[in-house]
Amino acid sequence: MASREDELRNCVVCGDQATGYHFNALTCEGCKGFFRRTVSKSIGPTCPFAGSCEVSKTQRRHCPACRLQKCLDAGMRKDMILSAEALALRRAKQAQRRAQQTPVQLSKEQEELIRTLLGAHTRHMGTMFEQFVQFRPPAHLFIHHQPLPTLAPVLPLVTHFADINTFMVLQVIKFTKDLPVFRSLPIEDQISLLKGAAVEICHIVLNTTFCLQTQNFLCGPLRYTIEDGARVSPTVGFQVEFLELLFHFHGTLRKLQLQEPEYVLLAAMALFSPDRPGVTQRDEIDQLQEEMALTLQSYIKGQQRRPRDRFLYAKLLGLLAELRSINEAYGYQIQHIQGLSAMMPLLQEICS
């Protein structure tokens, strides 16, 4: 027979062993996670049995509606659930504190992960930007205004833009397909992750070409300015507000002076985002993203950096969230530039 002390340690919702106070009630980890997930959804569950279902350790999964109601009756509060951004920031700060308290050294698995990412990056994206010159470039894009004699006739900038964007997305696809952990996922999840992250990875890698002094992208013999983005099409280009947001992002990221392993780990974190639409194996992908995040934290901690860079990981998390917003705005822009989406069906599919 359970003692009074044992009962006080049990989850007030299902009776399982409690791990502490979560959202204002003593609950187990299972009910804590259930409450956070369920409350975050826009549509709540409904009970087919008039709200009279048993909620116990063995029966708690049978009726989400009754389980949620019991959570609320037990005193769990919706207003105590952090937003995804606040939760990510809190985790970053907790990880930062742990990193400052103990010396961090990369494990063999983390070193192998970095080697794998760097190898795939070198094979498929290492010389990507130098190859832009192959794609029907307008003459004015040349830094010294001296087009090579073998160039094709000058074409509208929209044609060149469509070419290089399609090329970058194809290289990103090759990069991801070269990662064993990515190939191990169901093909449906691979597609969902690529649709969500391809543009973000393109911009993370493109940042290595951004020049802070001139505010241009220097890709081999070509340069790209904010004015080029505004006149992609003869009739309309990217909105100035969007371009200013994009160039501000690249300037902020470039100022952090990331090393190549940090760039590829940041790209991997963007790739393995479990909240992309259409993803089915969310727990597995969440674990992969956590693995990338922990490796990035360990790598940053192991570098001899300036004191002002002690919050580098938290800054990168903030930039990832900013890049997500840019990605959404980019898709909208692509659809509204005359003739652009029709010229690059692959990117149109990615942004749809």
UniProtKB/Swiss-Prot annotation:
Q: Which UniProt keywords apply?
A: Activator, Cytoplasm, Cytoskeleton, DNA-binding, Metal-binding, Nucleus, Phosphoprotein, Receptor, Transcription, Transcription regulation, Zinc, Zinc-finger
Q: What induces it?
A: By dexamethasone.
Indicate the segments annotated as coiled coil, or none if absent: none
- Subcellular location, record wording: Nucleus; Cytoplasm; Cytoplasm, Cytoskeleton
GO CC field: chromatin; cytoplasm; cytoskeleton; cytosol; nucleoplasm; nucleus
Tissue specificity note: Predominantly expressed in liver.
| Pfam families in alphabetical order | Hormone_recep, zf-C4
User: Which residues carry the post-translational modification Phosphothreonine, per the record?
Assistant: T38
- What CDD domains is this protein classified in? NR_DBD_VDR_like, NR_LBD_PXR_like
* Residue ranges constituting the NR LBD domain according to the UniProt record: 109-352
SMART domains tied to this protein: HOLI, ZnF_C4
PTM (free text): Phosphorylated at Thr-38 by PKC, dephosphorylation of Thr-38 is required for nuclear translocation and activation.
Main localization (coarse): nucleus
A molecular function (GO) term: RNA polymerase II transcription regulatory region sequence-specific DNA binding
Cross-referenced InterPro entries? NHR-like_dom_sf, Nucl_hrmn_rcpt_lig-bd, Nuclear_hormone_rcpt_NR1, Nuclear_hrmn_rcpt, ThyrH_rcpt, Znf_hrmn_rcpt, Znf_NHR/GATA
Zinc fingers, NR C4-type, are found at 11-31, 47-71
**DNA-binding region (UniProt annotation):** 8-83
According to its UniProt entry, what is the function of this protein?
Answer: Binds and transactivates the retinoic acid response elements that control expression of the retinoic acid receptor beta 2 and alcohol dehydrogenase 3 genes. Transactivates both the phenobarbital responsive element module of the human CYP2B6 gene and the CYP3A4 xenobiotic response element.
Q: What is known of its domains?
A: Composed by a short N-terminal domain followed by the DNA binding, hinge, and ligand binding/dimerization domains.
Question: Could you say which protein family the record assigns here?
Answer: Belongs to the nuclear hormone receptor family. NR1 subfamily.
Instruction: Describe its partners and assembly state.
Output: Interacts with ECT2. Heterodimer of NR1I3 and RXR. Interacts with PSMC4. Directly interacts with DNAJC7. The DNAJC7-NR1I3 complex may also include HSP90. Interacts with CRY1. Interacts with CRY2 in a ligand-dependent manner.
User: What's the name of the protein?
Assistant: Nuclear receptor subfamily 1 group I member 3
- Gene symbol here is NR1I3
